[in-house]
Amino acid sequence: AVAIAKANAIAQGEPVRLAPVKGVGEVSWVTPILKNGMEVPVKEKADLLLSANAAAMAAGANFVNSQLFLINEQKYFASSDGSYIDQDIHRIWPNFTVTAIDKASGRFRTRNAFSSPVGMGYEYLDGGNSIALPNGLKAYNDRYDIVEDAAQAARHAVEKLKAPTVKPGKYDLVLDPSNLFLTIHENVGHPLELDRVLGYEANYAGTSFA
């Protein structure tokens, strides 16, 4: 960290003056969880993923790839302002990709899980608090049902496979927020990173227009 700070100082136009911050002393913080995913047996986790795979295959998928990410970070933050913060951070992310294939044409379509990485424990997977939407769809808030979503994803992939090709032309486009925030991330977020601010090489997404 010291070496990086010294290297960055070479390109520094003027001294950096940090805003005064009052130290919080010795404190600790733990992600509020109801069930520690690290303590759940591996077999139970594997069985859950296999159940999701089976549900997707039964609903029309040809392939399923599922994962369960569990992270427990132990962080200690110390600052010259007098803050010493011990952090115990938990994150969980169940994810999958289902694929439906038209064997006659070789075309295929996919759909990913509707889950999100969240700062919760294994209780995130208990399937409660789902939100019923039109046409039998379900959305999820602070709980998630990976088996139910996998079956729904397979049906969506099959529907996409049967959908007609869009004819060339100009259309009004309605973007889902999950697509829009990715567009903003790539085309605005990366161009505003340090290499672009300092006038260095263009980032991997291309030249900035932000």
What are these regions (language model features)?
Residues A1-A210:
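Active-site bordering "gate/hinge" segments
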